[in-house]
Swiss-Prot record:
Protein name as it appears in the record: SWI5-dependent HO expression protein 3
Topology of this chain in the membrane: Peripheral membrane protein
Lineage of producing organism: Eukaryota, Fungi, Dikarya, Ascomycota, Saccharomycotina
Tagged with keyword Membrane: yes
Function: RNA-binding protein that binds specific mRNAs including the ASH1 mRNA, coding for a repressor of the HO endonuclease. Part of the mRNA localization machinery that restricts accumulation of certain proteins to the bud and in the daughter cell. Required for the delivery of cortical endoplasmic reticulum into the emerging bud.
Gene name tied to this protein: SHE3
Organism: Kluyveromyces lactis (strain ATCC 8585 / CBS 2359 / DSM 70799 / NBRC 1267 / NRRL Y-1140 / WM37) (Yeast)
Region (Disordered): 273-345
Amino acid sequence: MKMTEAQEFLTPTKGVNSSKFNINHGHFITNLENQESPSKLGAYTPGKYSTSRVIESLHKQIDELTSTNLKMTSQCHQLVNELESSGKKQNKQLETISRLQTENMNLNAILDRKTNRMNELESSLKKQTVFNEDAAKKNLELEETVKKLSLENEKLTEQSTLYKIQYEAIVDAHQSYKQFFTNETSTLRNDLMSLKQSMTKQLESKTKEVLAIDEKIQNKLESLDSAQESFKKHASEQIEDNIKELRLDSWQSSLREAQALLKEYKSQAQAEGITIQEQPKASIPQLRNPKRKTSGQKRTSFYGTPTGFSIPSNKQTPPSSSSTQLPGLKRASSIRISSDPNRNR
């Protein structure tokens, strides 16, 4: 069924959310609770109230409720209109906010660019200031230099006038000496040509001698380099042969076996009640590698051997036969303690 316009007007919740009436709904309920109703007045007694009064009171309450409903409905429409207008305002404000945000972002980007440009300009300004200060200092120095040069120029001008007078006197004397020196110059020119030819011949002969000496020196250096390489090779081969003759690996294995036998002998002696006093072991001497000479130490002379090497000798010192003991071991002296005489019986 379709509602009439009056019913739609009297219906406050038509097309409106119930949350919109929360503001005035509390006041309406409070007014209803404060009004007296027949149920609040206690049980009805025919002696106190009549039916007409009850009906009148009910009509009054209905009229009051109707007027209150009309007021609430009008307030509801007003609130709806205000809500719609506030929604439109909010949409406009949101659009304005978004537009202002985009403008703010653009302005921030522009501000960042301007800030960067300002920093660049400040740095360039500092550099230019330093450059200007340096230029000002140089300008002051140049001004002082100009002053000094102007003073020197004045002195030189005075000297030039004096020199001019002297020059005129010298020119006069030169004319008289010119003829004499012309003759002398011709004779000296002839002597110079002959001297030049003789010096050229001597220079050519000396150059040939120097080239021959240089060639001899180069040959000597090459022979010294080859002798140095052969000495290095011979020394390395001799060192390897000496290491092979020493047979360090077999000596180390023999040393380990001797140490094992010594430990076994000590354990047996301690089991028999014999104490052994050990002397400190001698350390095995380390093999020394031949010292390497740097290129700065291998200085050679034109007619001698390299200063960093000596002539190798083929003589080898044989190992001493008197020391038959292995290196690192010494005979430990044992002292017998008096044991039980009945033990060996």
